[in-house]
From Swiss-Prot:
GO terms for biological process: tetrahydromethanopterin biosynthetic process. This is GTP cyclohydrolase MptA. Binds 1 Fe(2+) ion per subunit. Homodimer. GO terms for molecular function: GTP cyclohydrolase I activity; GTP cyclohydrolase IV activity; iron ion binding. Keywords: Hydrolase, Iron, Metal-binding. Belongs to the GTP cyclohydrolase IV family. Converts GTP to 7,8-dihydro-D-neopterin 2',3'-cyclic phosphate, the first intermediate in the biosynthesis of coenzyme methanopterin. It comes from Haloquadratum walsbyi (strain DSM 16790 / HBSQ001). The gene is mptA. Its EC number is 3.5.4.39. It holds the Pfam family GCHY-1. It is an enzyme of class 3 (hydrolase). The lineage of its organism: Archaea, Methanobacteriati, Methanobacteriota, Stenosarchaea group, Halobacteria.
């Protein structure tokens, strides 16, 4: 074309309202995570990338912006990556540099990570999938990064279990079994309760890069539920999972509080201004609704609450 096309995106909008996030979603990239002395992990990661838009600008130059985003992501993922949250931070900072009209750049990444483990009783090799959650927000004041995981486990309802134990106690009383024997039996043989598949999410956000291990976060979230679950389960494994879940029945509230306690105990080195996000959602087995509990809190406040328990 012989003439310059108008830059519509740079024009003034009819309604001068600023937008907090404008960008692209569902951007798939291969990410290779280097590990000292071990085979690198290769992830198919999905990115969401946003910048803010001032009130006097109509748009973000979507096509050109996508090229910038793609080049920036490609440069980040093609290099040596040891922490995905640092990679997100690098992308966010580069985007902030390349957009003179923006004050905030946000990058979010999700990916599935497959881990090798053994079943709890039969000790057979199997695989476990955890969802990696990483993000970063860059501003002129600095960059905050988030890392965490979403995992699946099993919970048992304490209320339902309590009713079953009460019924068992009444039956044994009617059979003239001594109280001490009844209580010993109930202690050693947890009574049935309705179960749920639990979805636990645990993330930590801090200035720069949170000094936490992704796998440790996943383990804390898994162990906060009544029991871990496994893709492969022979009969001894099914018995193990069922027994241990019923021996540690928990509400969704209990799961979040278990995460809170373990985070405080495990990450004493983190600064007080780190933010912890804990979430538990359970798929109910006997209800048409599901159960949910969550908390987002600074580590300073969480430490104070846990120490007061």
């Amino acid at each position: 074309m012989s003439h310059q096309l108008p830059d519509i995106q740079a024009s003034r909008p009819d309604v001068t309202v600023g937008l907090s996030q404008v960008g692209v979603t569902d951007v798939d990239k291969l990410v290779k995570i280097e590990r000292d002395g071990e085979t690198p992990l290769v992830l198919m990661a999905e990115f969401e990338v946003f910048v803010d838009l001032p009130s006097g600008r109509k748009g973000i130059d979507m096509s050109r912006n996508m090229q910038v985003i793609d080049e920036t992501l490609e440069a980040a993922v093609s290099g040596s990556v040891s922490r995905v949250e640092d990679m997100c931070g690098d992308v966010a900072e580069r985007l902030l540099e390349k957009h003179e009209y923006t004050t905030t750049a946000t990058v979010e990444m999700t990916a599935d990570l497959v881990m090798h483990e053994d079943t709890p009783a039969s000790e057979l090799p199997t695989q476990n999938t955890i969802s990696i959650l990483a993000s970063a927000t860059a501003t002129d004041e600095g960059t905050r990064e988030e890392i965490g995981a979403e995992v699946i486990g099993m919970t048992v309802c304490p209320c339902s279990q309590g009713m079953s134990a009460s019924r068992a106690r009444d039956v044994m009383h009617d059979l003239d079994i001594e109280d001490e024997t009844i209580e010993t039996f109930l202690e050693q043989v947890p009574q049935p309760g309705h179960s749920q598949r639990g979805h636990a999410t645990l993330t930590v956000t801090a200035d720069g890069s949170p000094d936490v291990d992704l796998i440790e976060l996943a383990d804390i979230a898994r162990d906060a539920m009544s029991a871990r679950i496994y893709n492969l389960a022979k009969r001894p494994d099914e018995d193990y999972m069922t027994y241990h879940a019923h021996a540690d029945a928990k509400f969704v509230e209990d799961c979040v509080r278990s995460m809170a306690e373990q985070v405080v105990n495990s990450f004493e080195h983190l600064d007080d201004d780190a933010v912890v996000r804990m979430k538990q959602s359970n798929d109910e087995s006997i209800h048409q609704h599901n159960a949910h509990a969550e908390r987002e809190v600074t580590l300073e406040q969480l430490r104070a609450e846990v120490s007061a328990s």
